Amino acid sequence: MAKHDSHLRCSFCNKSQDQVRKLIAGPGVYICDECVELCNEILEEELYDGNTPPATAPAASRRETPRKSSRSLPSLAQLPKPREIMRYLDQYVIGQEKAKKVLSVAVYNHYKRLAAKANPNSLGAAELDEVELQKSNILVIGPTGSGKTLLAETLARMLDVPFAVADATTLTEAGYVGEDVENILLRLLQVADMDVEEAQRGIIYIDEIDKIARKSENPSITRDVSGEGVQQALLKMLEGTIANVPPQGGRKHPYQDCIQIDTSNILFICGGAFVGLEKVIEQRIGKKSMGFIKPGEQLAVTREQRLADALKALEPEDLIKYGMIPEFIGRLPVVATLDPLDEKALEAILTQPKNAILKQAQKLLRMDGVELEFEPAAISAIAKEAYRRKTGARALRAIVEELMLDVMYEVPSRRDIKYVRITAEMVERRSTHELIPHPSTLPKPESA
């Protein structure tokens, strides 16, 4: 038997087991340690191409060595100023002037802080060299459909940084059914093509943050795993920490190597509608509705104005009474409140932004060689119906999509249609089957 073992050879290089350090046996084949090393070198050259640390390096060093970023951090002189950020936001977001100003200043200061860390000698004043600039995360409060997510998306697009959106309602404490808070960082990492350095200067928008308010003002003896427990889990991430992020999600693959991400340079924007917050504010300031209100439209305007006035008097203690823990509110020092959208604002949203819904519909039809026109009365009718639905700007797209269904269906197949006009009557009937062809395309009457 020993004689037979001495003639075992590598199936690739044909060296005997006496000529190599290790011979690995498989089902009918053998491979030596030298061939394994050669295969490893080939894989490194072809697959990694120098962007990832070698597989032979320790796991810790592979996690901590980020891929070289394709986009460098702009210098202080290259950063867009708050006025420039505001002008850019004006192109996509209608109204909300106070919120846009607050966000412009907060975002500028955040990335100015990153530029100062990258270029510490650019400050000039020696007495300020030891001053540490701390991060200021942002809390955005406003009714549904008022533009909270749109503001965050537009800021990220202007600054050309990775941007990820997370839903707070799916988060739970570690060990319970649901998503871990580290999955938020995983989304940002995926948007940055797994580039750690790039992800560490990105923006994360956490939506529905009001849904993780604790169920009662007083701490409970039972665990609140999707409310206060999530707030506690988010504290260190918001403040800045080295987080271990599982690249495939932590629950289904518990034994994978984690990627380390420093969250101290990531800007967190938390948004929520905070339904009922105005009642908490009014209770604090002792304001009560008195007298009689006529039914109908005046009631809606009064409720809208009541919400806007209440948010102007917002204090941190109101958010704490609502169910947010003090430590969580303390890590969101910048607060921007958005006003409810009235009919006039909804009309402007339909037509003024660069990506306005009506402009998108006109462009789609123009690709089929058809001009689309909305009468002013039709635009007002769409805004009025959207306001009635009480879902903010989101209702506009739903109404326009429903209204344009017949047009989008008929136009590509009909060469006689070169012009379509949408009237207020069509909006009220939710139907556009009466297509209006351009006079030049109508058949000419036969001469006698």
UniProtKB/Swiss-Prot annotation:
Q: Where is this region: Disordered?
A: 50-76
The signal sequence is none
Q: Which PROSITE patterns match?
A: CLPX_ZB
Per UniProt, the keywords (alphabetical) are: ATP-binding, Chaperone, Metal-binding, Nucleotide-binding, Zinc
> Which residues does the annotation say bind ATP?
143-150
Domain ClpX-type ZB spans what residues?
Answer: 1-51
User: Pfam families in the record, alphabetically?
Assistant: AAA_2 (PF07724), ClpB_D2-small (PF10431), zf-C4_ClpX (PF06689)
Q: Please name the GO terms of the biological process aspect recorded for this protein, alphabetically.
A: cell division; proteolysis involved in protein catabolic process
SUPFAM superfamilies this protein is in? Glucocorticoid receptor-like (DNA-binding domain), P-loop containing nucleoside triphosphate hydrolases
Chain positions recorded as Zn(2+) binding sites: 10, 13, 32, 35
Select a single GO molecular function from the record's annotations and give it. unfolded protein binding
Gene Ontology CC: HslUV protease complex
Q: Which CDD domains match?
A: RecA-like_ClpX
| Quaternary structure and interacting proteins, as annotated | Component of the ClpX-ClpP complex. Forms a hexameric ring that, in the presence of ATP, binds to fourteen ClpP subunits assembled into a disk-like structure with a central cavity, resembling the structure of eukaryotic proteasomes.
Q: What does this protein do?
A: ATP-dependent specificity component of the Clp protease. It directs the protease to specific substrates. Can perform chaperone functions in the absence of ClpP.
What does the sequence similarity comment in the record state about its family? Belongs to the ClpX chaperone family.
> Which protein is depicted?
ATP-dependent Clp protease ATP-binding subunit ClpX
Annotated organism of origin: Synechococcus sp. (strain JA-3-3Ab) (Cyanobacteria bacterium Yellowstone A-Prime)
Q: Which gene specifies this protein's sequence? A: clpX
